[in-house]
């Protein structure tokens, strides 16, 4: 009889825990973070649920608390890659540069094929202007993932490291491989404009506009090239299109004014 009671108790406990986990997942899916935290705090939570709690805390802007929760998990489970990645994300938000790099590096040591951790590690190096390190890592990453995102990060690192010609060739190779990558088109267009190669900027951006004439980033470089080349009527039309799409940035308004004044 006692065995039956024990089995019933265990079965009931498992059922309640499963129901609670399902409720947590539903609340997370609905971004109802307060409910997530309340449900998890009501029971002795597993590491997986504590990670969900950390995500909820981060979603509510309580990033320091989220990091503390994750650090407790990492003490108990130092090889939990999800907890390590989430801790790195929290450190990034809290401007804890070295700590974030350390967490990403740990994930990369545990799993050298972890593309996301390697990408974020490299991007963090770039954001903190460690361009040489970012270039080295982006080259290594490109051997595993030749996506436009990775190749663009390589080109940006070259640009930051004072390698403008190499970065131009890198952007060109990206555009040939991924013609729809508007960020690379805009970046290369910006380089052409900086070098006063306005014809190159116009040719590049007009080629992209033939498939998508609405992209704000590309149209900014296109309009700027026309303005700096003193083709003011076309520049005005491009800038008017930009402002009609809600672009009220300082440079757009400034060069629209310059174009009007020049005519």
Language-model features, listed with the residues they occupy:
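N-terminal leader/linker segments that initiate helical-solenoid repeat arrays
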Residues: 16-71, 75, 79-82
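Register position in tetratricopeptide repeats
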Residues: 29, 59, 93-94, 127-128, ...
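Canonical positions in the second alpha-helix
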Residues: 39, 43, 72-73, 106-107, ...
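Short coil turns that delineate tetratricopeptide repeat
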Residues: 44, 78, 112, 145-146, ...
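Start-of-helix register in tetratricopeptide repeats
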Residues: 48, 82, 116, 149-150, ...
